[in-house]
């Protein structure tokens, strides 16, 4: 998994946005993908969303939240949006850095390679903050190993779609978000592991602003091959996905 996975040799246009409604960001992705197919640049969107659940194509009915989940007394219910990405259901919201790479992939297409590069970029960001993470075989995303009586915990989720050799959707890194919202769903369809954040693991507040630049650099380097994909010890063979 060396060398660039992109079909273009031009730089990636990184756009660091603020809080963007999910449906607005989804349409932005589609517009950028159309532009990329027409010869436009590769783009990386980095942003946050107001609280929302997004359900991938493989989401089962029992994995969804109930008709209303307020999270806290008096809070507004959280919408559920059905999407065309892979994977199952997850939550997005304040304190979580979401990245949408709109990238033209080189031939032959290798979506697994692409996902591994996204994982590698986030593993590096976590390591640079002093947090060891890795992969779990059979499950996408970035994980904290089990230990000290605690199960494996997902710190970053990945769900993508590739159409016309162009990527949409992407990754979500939990920085300083409210993890309670995950309790209303079966996150990513996985019931035997937990969800965590940089702040929860490092014992200090790690905001989106602190990691956004590092994530942009790491993702661009991983896609271009400057950050090679490596094996990370501690992964186990998952019993289910």
From Swiss-Prot:
Top-level taxon of origin: Bacteria
Localization per record: Cytoplasm
List of catalytic residues: 188 (acyl-thioester intermediate)
Residues marked Lowers pKa of active site Cys (site): 154
Enzyme Commission number(s) from the entry: 2.3.1.181
Reactions listed under catalytic activity: octanoyl-[ACP] + L-lysyl-[protein] = N(6)-octanoyl-L-lysyl-[protein] + holo-[ACP] + H(+)
Protein residues bound to substrate: 85-92, 157-159, 170-172
TM spans (from-to): none
Keywords: Acyltransferase, Cytoplasm, Transferase
Domain BPL/LPL catalytic: residue ranges: 38-227
Any one annotated GO CC term: cytoplasm
Pfam families: LplA-B_cat
Cell inner membrane keyword on record: no
PROSITE patterns referenced in this protein's UniProt entry, alphabetically: BPL_LPL_CATALYTIC, LIPB
MF (Gene Ontology): lipoyl(octanoyl) transferase activity
Principal subcellular localisation of the protein: cytoplasm
GO annotation, biological process: protein modification process
Protein's pathway: Protein modification; protein lipoylation via endogenous pathway; protein N(6)-(lipoyl)lysine from octanoyl-[acyl-carrier-protein]: step 1/2
Role noted for this protein: Catalyzes the transfer of endogenously produced octanoic acid from octanoyl-acyl-carrier-protein onto the lipoyl domains of lipoate-dependent enzymes. Lipoyl-ACP can also act as a substrate although octanoyl-ACP is likely to be the physiological substrate.
Family indicated by similarity: Belongs to the LipB family.
Misc. comment: In the reaction, the free carboxyl group of octanoic acid is attached via an amide linkage to the epsilon-amino group of a specific lysine residue of lipoyl domains of lipoate-dependent enzymes.
Protein's recorded name: Octanoyltransferase
Organism the protein comes from: Mycobacterium marinum (strain ATCC BAA-535 / M)
